[in-house]
């Protein structure tokens, strides 16, 4: 087993490594988005290398990370992460609306996403939602809740990943299939350039299903209260 304790660089983001590996052969370590969130795992590369990943706990692998490089053979072990597709909702149109309309639409959109237990991140005037159901169902939810005026599209997760910070990527792609979640509006002070809408897991139904609720209740989480639509 080859022990990997450090990431050398990233061939997709680092110009230095892009130049170094422009003629290299890539031996890929293929991970799904859940595996990529683990700082420790053991897996074979596509060429059969037995790799033991043992990174610091706060470090997670990203698509394009270089784990090893043999200059003599010009072979590099590079991470390939298979990400879910993402629904991208464009909020730019709201800039022309009145403050009251803007607040109302954002609140209703956050409620609609949270009521479906969908993870989401807002950034660059867009909302990113990883697919956990068929695109036709997500399309139907958007139209049923009256968001036809908000342009939305479906793109590959790899297209969105470079736009995200590490914490946003973990939030969006880390276990996106876990659907027991609710919407949380974060303080701008949490991350200077981060997102304003986060979704965090809150409870397990135990049966692996999602559903909508139709009655209201409020409860406390220690130092703050908030309402949920149930």
Swiss-Prot record:
Basic residues: bias regions: 200-210
Primary localisation category: cytoplasm
Source domain of life: Bacteria
InterPro entries (UniProt xref): UreE, UreE_N, UreE_N_sf
Biased composition range(s): Basic and acidic residues: 211-230
Keyword Chaperone carried by entry: yes
Family: Belongs to the UreE family.
Entries under NCBIfam families matching the protein: PRK13262.1
UniProt-recorded name of the protein: Urease accessory protein UreE
Source organism (scientific name): Yersinia enterocolitica
Higher taxonomy: Bacteria, Pseudomonadati, Pseudomonadota, Gammaproteobacteria, Enterobacterales
């Amino acid at each position: 087993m080859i022990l990997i304790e450090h990431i050398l660089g990233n061939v997709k983001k680092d110009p230095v490594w892009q130049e170094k590996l422009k003629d290299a052969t890539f031996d890929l370590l293929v991970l799904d988005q859940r595996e990529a969130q683990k700082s420790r795992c053991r897996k074979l590369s596509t060429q059969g290398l037995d790799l033991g990943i043992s990174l610091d706990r706060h470090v997670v692998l990203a698509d394009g990370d270089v784990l090893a490089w043999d200059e003599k053979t010009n072979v590099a072990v590079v991470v390939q992460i298979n990400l879910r597709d993402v629904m991208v909702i464009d909020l730019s149109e709201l800039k022309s609306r009145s403050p009251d309309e803007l607040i109302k639409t954002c609140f209703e959109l956050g409620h609609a996403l949270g009521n479906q237990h969908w993870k989401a991140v807002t950034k660059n005037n867009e909302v990113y939602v990883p697919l956990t159901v068929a695109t036709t169902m997500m399309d139907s939810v958007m139209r049923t809740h009256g968001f036809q005026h908000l342009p939305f599209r479906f793109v590959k997760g790899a297209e969105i990943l470079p736009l995200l910070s590490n914490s946003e990527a973990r939030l969006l792609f880390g276990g996106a299939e876990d659907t027991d979640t609710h919407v949380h509006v974060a303080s701008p002070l949490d991350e200077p350039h981060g997102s304003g809408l986060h979704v965090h897991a809150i409870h397990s139904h135990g049966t692996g299903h999602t559903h909508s609720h139709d009655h209201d209740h409020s409860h406390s989480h220690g130092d703050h209260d908030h309402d949920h639509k149930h």
